[in-house]
From Swiss-Prot:
GO biological process terms held by the UniProt record: regulation of DNA-templated transcription; regulation of RNA stability; regulation of translation, ncRNA-mediated
Gene assigned in the entry: hfq
Role according to the record: RNA chaperone that binds small regulatory RNA (sRNAs) and mRNAs to facilitate mRNA translational regulation in response to envelope stress, environmental stress and changes in metabolite concentrations. Also binds with high specificity to tRNAs.
Name assigned to this protein: RNA-binding protein Hfq
Domain Sm residue range list: 8-68
Single Gene Ontology MF annotation: RNA binding
Gene source species: Bacillus velezensis (strain DSM 23117 / BGSC 10A6 / LMG 26770 / FZB42)
Pfam families, per the entry: Hfq (PF17209)
Superkingdom of the source species: Bacteria
Family statement: Belongs to the Hfq family.
Length: 73
Protein backbone atom coordinates (compact mmCIF):
# COMPACT_ATOMS: atom_id res chain seq x y z
CA UNK A 1 0.00 0.00 0.00
CA UNK A 2 1.38 3.40 -1.03
CA UNK A 3 1.76 5.91 1.83
CA UNK A 4 -0.57 8.91 1.74
CA UNK A 5 1.13 12.25 1.12
CA UNK A 6 -1.35 14.73 2.57
CA UNK A 7 0.85 17.75 1.85
CA UNK A 8 1.04 17.03 -1.88
CA UNK A 9 -2.67 16.16 -2.11
CA UNK A 10 -3.60 19.37 -0.29
CA UNK A 11 -1.37 21.63 -2.40
CA UNK A 12 -2.42 19.94 -5.64
CA UNK A 13 -6.13 20.28 -4.83
CA UNK A 14 -5.91 24.00 -3.99
CA UNK A 15 -3.84 24.47 -7.17
CA UNK A 16 -6.39 22.65 -9.36
CA UNK A 17 -9.36 24.45 -7.75
CA UNK A 18 -7.65 27.89 -7.92
CA UNK A 19 -8.52 28.31 -4.24
CA UNK A 20 -7.34 31.54 -2.64
CA UNK A 21 -5.10 30.89 0.36
CA UNK A 22 -3.40 32.86 3.08
CA UNK A 23 0.15 31.61 3.64
CA UNK A 24 1.56 32.35 7.08
CA UNK A 25 5.34 32.49 7.22
CA UNK A 26 7.44 31.65 10.27
CA UNK A 27 8.36 35.33 10.68
CA UNK A 28 4.65 36.22 11.01
CA UNK A 29 4.31 37.70 7.53
CA UNK A 30 1.16 36.78 5.58
CA UNK A 31 0.89 36.25 1.83
CA UNK A 32 -2.40 35.85 -0.03
CA UNK A 33 -2.91 34.37 -3.45
CA UNK A 34 -3.29 31.18 -5.46
CA UNK A 35 -0.89 28.24 -5.59
CA UNK A 36 0.30 27.83 -9.19
CA UNK A 37 2.82 25.05 -8.56
CA UNK A 38 4.99 23.31 -5.98
CA UNK A 39 7.80 20.82 -5.59
CA UNK A 40 9.61 19.22 -2.65
CA UNK A 41 11.15 22.51 -1.52
CA UNK A 42 9.12 25.44 -2.86
CA UNK A 43 5.60 26.77 -3.52
CA UNK A 44 4.83 29.17 -6.38
CA UNK A 45 2.18 31.67 -5.24
CA UNK A 46 0.49 34.17 -7.57
CA UNK A 47 -0.95 37.40 -6.19
CA UNK A 48 -2.54 40.03 -8.45
CA UNK A 49 -0.64 38.72 -11.47
CA UNK A 50 2.73 38.64 -9.69
CA UNK A 51 4.51 35.43 -8.77
CA UNK A 52 6.43 34.67 -5.59
CA UNK A 53 8.53 31.55 -5.03
CA UNK A 54 8.37 30.64 -1.34
CA UNK A 55 10.61 28.08 0.30
CA UNK A 56 8.58 25.53 2.27
CA UNK A 57 10.92 25.73 5.26
CA UNK A 58 9.78 29.36 5.70
CA UNK A 59 6.05 28.44 5.76
CA UNK A 60 4.10 27.86 8.95
CA UNK A 61 0.50 27.43 7.74
CA UNK A 62 -1.76 27.40 4.67
CA UNK A 63 -5.26 28.76 5.34
CA UNK A 64 -7.54 28.19 2.32
CA UNK A 65 -10.70 30.28 1.89
CA UNK A 66 -12.78 27.10 1.58
CA UNK A 67 -12.43 23.54 2.81
CA UNK A 68 -10.26 21.22 0.73
CA UNK A 69 -11.56 17.75 -0.12
CA UNK A 70 -8.84 15.08 0.14
CA UNK A 71 -8.96 11.35 -0.58
CA UNK A 72 -7.16 9.82 2.39
CA UNK A 73 -7.74 6.17 1.49
Amino acid sequence: MKPINIQDQFLNQIRKDNTFVTVFLLNGFQLRGQVKGFDNFTVLLETEGKQQLIYKHAISTFAPQKNVQLELE
